[in-house]
From Swiss-Prot:
Transmembrane segments: 73-92, 103-124, 132-151, 155-174, 309-327, 333-350, 631-652, 661-676
Side Extracellular, residues: 93-102, 152-154, 328-332, 653-660
Gene: cadA
Pfam short name (any one): Hydrolase
Name the record gives this protein: Cadmium, zinc and cobalt-transporting ATPase
Record-listed Mg(2+) binding positions: 578, 582
Binding site for Co(2+): 11, 14
Subcellular location: Cell membrane
Binding residues for Cd(2+): 11, 14
Keywords: ATP-binding, Cadmium, Cell membrane, Cobalt, Cobalt transport, Copper, Copper transport, Ion transport, Magnesium, Membrane, Metal-binding, Nucleotide-binding, Phosphoprotein, Translocase, Transmembrane, Transmembrane helix, Transport, Zinc, Zinc transport
PROSITE patterns given in the database record: HMA_2 (PS50846)
Residues involved in Zn(2+) binding: 11, 14
């Protein structure tokens, strides 16, 4: 699929119509016009023909493969129109001279033409393309009808206020787009490659694995790599949501898109730019907002029928009452024009996708990557969550929580011998014991041997040391009376004598309890833990969190347990895992979330990726989803209510046309401002 950036398209309804027209063509497999990011995705067998159709429907639209800045709308024509309109109206009402009145009406005609230039051109283009219910066509029809019933000043005021509204709307849209583009602007735009003693400025995409790049203070790291020389602080807020700078030095892994805050770094490239963390993040966010939620699809379909329906209502208001003898045609045509004033669905067509985009953007800034707006919408409907334990609720890091010596040996003796036996091991349990001892083994270790599933043995200071589980002691016929201990136990024996054991456990993540309590308050009704770990460890964590659990689950068992969990409870269910061993369950869930890091994004298959590995982000993304949904519903209800109110006012004759125009424009601006609140969640 080809991706284009465009300029010259300033109407969201026009974007929807262009997308619909392209998708109707037999030579187009798929077309998506994303108004909020000025992006066109096009998959076609005949690109020249597709581009020609775009030019026919939107002559001012310019396509480019590079992002281009849009020119800001000029306020001069609008200001000129307003000034001349006020002069003309004042002259009509306060001057009795015939020549002044004639001049004033000539001025009104000029104002009408200047203010309505874009409307005339848009209407002409719409009629040529057989789009008779285009907003420009309807606005032109309304003003001509107003002239026809003698409401000359109001006809011109409609055009002036409509132009003012369009100008303010364009400014608001431009501002919102700037916020959205800033979100996607985390990608570096250049790299300084070191070749020998020469420095070359190149595109990040031109870098190869093994290249060396120089990154100065204030510059972005072009792609993922490893620090060869230098020490610095990196700002990774745009990638992980972490506000505190990260300290890096020689041999530290760094992420593309990080901003260098201090010192010069020499970095060896470890990933091509296309595979880098920052490229994946930009791609995920861009792809997310290019999709349409169910609400957006409904609004797009609704807008297709809304305008013709309102036009029909306006026609009925204008014709039926006078034909039935209730008043004259001029009065009812004037009232029917009210319906035409509210015939444009812009308030909904703009605000709904912008609201979802803002929600995705707010999540991204917090280190939460949502892969589609459909996911954000579905997340607001989730009532049930199942958690993996290790690496999700717990840190996935073992710690020594108890040391039990057997007299005459001490805790120090047990830790020392266990450390010496496991000094060459890289197993997480061995590392936790070494960390607890806090000293290095002072004696030479010989004959080190790992025995799969049991433990290790080694010779140290003329002693044979064994460190392992209960089965290890039985294998070597070492007497002991501690066979039924619960938990992860490392027994230690020296020269065939059991000297004690060490209890090792995974620890809960910070704020895990607060997070689950927060989820309950946020509307989650049912939670459980699905773990592949043994019963004791899972039970201990579940007890701390006051949560049901299932332990000793293989991947297929975990999938079946989650299916049962889904079947037992109504509404959508989500699974939160580490994204590594939970693939079947992640795929089964209505919404799937994985705890990971920014460097693992390309490996994740979940709908949502928490790049900062924080449980607080699980609660935050729920709040974002619910607030986004609430804001969008507010906009829909508000816009439809105001439009209905103006139709009623039109029927009763209690307001003038220019008030209807201002009201309709005001609805759009308020809905737009309300949608932008999602960016600040």
């Amino acid at each position: 699929m080809q991706k284009y950036h465009f300029t010259g398209l300033d109407c969201p309804d026009c974007a929807n119509k262009l997308e619909s027209a392209l998708n109707k063509q037999s030579y187009v497999q798929e077309a998506r016009v994303v108004f909020n990011t000025n992006t066109l995705y096009l998959k076609t067998q005949d690109m020249p023909k597709a581009l020609a159709l775009i030019k026919q429907l939107e002559p001012d639209m310019e396509l480019s493969e590079q992002v281009q800045s849009e020119a800001k709308p000029s306020a001069i024509p609008l200001l000129l129109s307003v000034v001349l309109y006020l002069i003309a109206v004042a002259t009509i009402h306060f001057s009795a001279q015939n020549w002044a009145l004639h001049l004033s009406y000539a001025l009104l005609a000029g104002v009408y033409l200047v203010a309505g230039k874009d409307v005339f051109l848009g209407a002409l283009r719409a009629i040529r393309n057989k789009q008779f219910f285009d907003e420009n066509t309807l606005m032109l029809s309304a003003t001509i009808a107003a002239f026809g019933v003698g409401a000359h000043e109001e006809a011109v005021s409609i055009m002036v206020f409509y132009s003012a509204g369009e100008f303010l709307q364009q400014l608001a849209i431009a501002r919102s787009k700037q916020s959205l583009h800033a979100l996607l602007d985390v990608a570096p735009n250049h790299a300084v490659r070191k070749v020998g003693q020469e420095l070359q400025e190149v595109e990040p995409s031109a870098l190869a694995i093994g290249d060396v790049v120089i990154v100065k203070v204030g510059e972005k790291i072009p792609t993922d790599g490893v620090v060869l020389r230098g020490e610095s602080l990196l700002d990774q807020k745009a990638l992980t949501g972490e506000s505190l700078p990260v300290n890096v030095k020689e041999h530290s892994a760094v992420l593309g898109g990080s901003i260098n805050l201090k010192g010069v770094l020499e970095i060896q490239v470890s990933k091509l730019y296309a595979d880098s963390s920052v490229a994946k993040i930009v791609d995920l966010v861009s792809n997310a907002v290019s999709q349409k939620s169910q609400t957006e699809k409904f609004i797009t379909t609704f807008a297709r029928y809304y305008t013709p329906a309102v036009f029909a209502i306006a026609l009925l208001i204008a014709l039926v009452p006078p034909l039935l003898g209730h008043g004259d045609f001029d009065t009812w045509i004037y009232r029917g024009l009210f319906a035409l004033m509210v015939s444009c669905p812009c308030a909904l067509v703009i605000s709904v996708p912008l609201g979802y985009f803002g929600g995705v953007g707010a999540a991204s800034r917090a280190g939460i990557l949502i892969k589609s707006v459909q996911t954000l919408e579905a997340l607001s409907q989730v009532k049930n969550i199942a958690f993996d334990k290790t690496g999700t609720l717990s840190k996935g890091e073992f710690n020594v929580i108890d040391v039990v010596p057997i007299a005459p040996f001490s805790k120090e003796d047990v830790l020392q011998h266990a450390t010496c036996a496991q000094i060459l091991s890289t197993h997480p349990i061995a590392i936790s014991i070494q960390k607890a001892y806090k000293r290095q083994c002072q004696h030479e270790v010989k004959d080190y041997q790992e025995i799969g599933g049991l433990g290790v043995q080694a010779s140290c200071h003329s002693h044979l040391i064994i460190a392992g589980n209960d089965k290890m002691l039985h294998k070597y016929n070492i007497p002991h009376d501690t066979c039924s201990l619960e938990g992860t136990i490392v027994h230690v024996a020296v020269d065939g004598k059991h000297i004690g054991y060490i209890v090792v456990a995974d620890t809960l993540k910070d704020n895990a309890k607060e997070c689950l309590d927060g989820l309950k308050h946020a509307g989650i009704e049912h939670m459980c833990i699905l773990s592949g770990d043994h019963e004791y460890s899972t039970k201990r964590v579940a007890k701390e969190l006051d949560c049901p659990y299932y332990a000793n689950l293989l991947p297929e068992d975990k999938l079946n347990a989650f299916k049962d969990f889904q079947a037992q409870h109504a509404h959508k269910s989500m699974f939160v895992g580490d994204g590594i061993n939970d693939a079947p369950t992640l795929a089964r869930a209505d919404v799937s979330m994985s705890m990971g890091s920014a460097s693992q994004i390309s490996k994740e298959s979940a709908d949502i990726v928490i790049t900062n590995n924080s449980l607080e982000s699980v609660l935050k993304v729920f709040k974002i989803a619910k607030k986004t949904k609430r804001i969008i519903i507010e906009n829909i209800i508000f816009a439809l209510a105001i439009k209905a109110m103006f139709i009623v006012l039109g029927l009763s004759g209690d307001a003038s046309l220019w008030e209807a125009v201002l009201g309709d424009v005001g609805v759009t601006l308020i809905a737009l401002a309300n949608s932008m609140r999602t960016m600040r969640i």
